Amino acid sequence: QLHPTVGLVEILDEILGAVDVFELRPRIGMASSALAHRIPESEKVGNIVVSAAWAVVGRWREAYDEQDVARAGSLLERMGLVGMVDRTWGTLSEGECKRVEIARALMTDPELLLLDEPAAGLDLAGREQLVEVLSAIFTDPDAPASVLVTHHLEEIPAGVTHALVMAEGRIVAAGPVETTLTSEVLSGAFGMPLTVSHVDGRWNARAAH
């Protein structure tokens, strides 16, 4: 809903402010804490996911289409959440909630997937489960274009091709991930000497000695 103070924002060949947001919304899937905070604890997982087809949160007033219900179930299975359709939001772990949010974001088969710090607040096990799920999504040849926001290299899944590094609200580097997430770039961005490594498809950064 934010608009720039100067310039234009173009998303999927549409200019914000010159396009009907209700037409644009189904083309973009988003998972963020802002959405999660709007979900009632008593809401069932199946309703949370399938209601994305109508761009609402929770139970829709109309009967669900069988195809939508089946897609929601398939997405939950893909997220490793088999048998959780009737679980309520308030009974889920933090990691399970994050994966439900991603299933919901994929419900409309979007052209663009936005993930705003999806691993924030997760313990080690929850993070690794999430990274595994995201790696499967990002390496799928039919996956939508995706943008992942994170402060931690360890959360970057396989399949990421490009990176943009920001510091103090400004872009300091952008380009192919291998030439952008370097020790030099990240040391400058974080203001301390860092050693960056990329081993077995996973990124890591530690203090340089």
Locate each region found by the language model:
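Conserved ABC transporter NBD signature motif
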Residues: G7-A18
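ABC-family P-loop ATPase nucleotide-binding domains
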Residues: L35-T91
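Conserved catalytic motifs of ABC-family nucleotide-binding domains
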Residues: D109
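Catalytic Walker B motif of ABC-type/P-loop ATPase nucleotide-binding domains
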Residues: L113-E117
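H-loop/switch region of ABC-family ATPase nucleotide-binding domains
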Residues: T150-H151
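ABC ATPase nucleotide-binding domains
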Residues: S187-H209
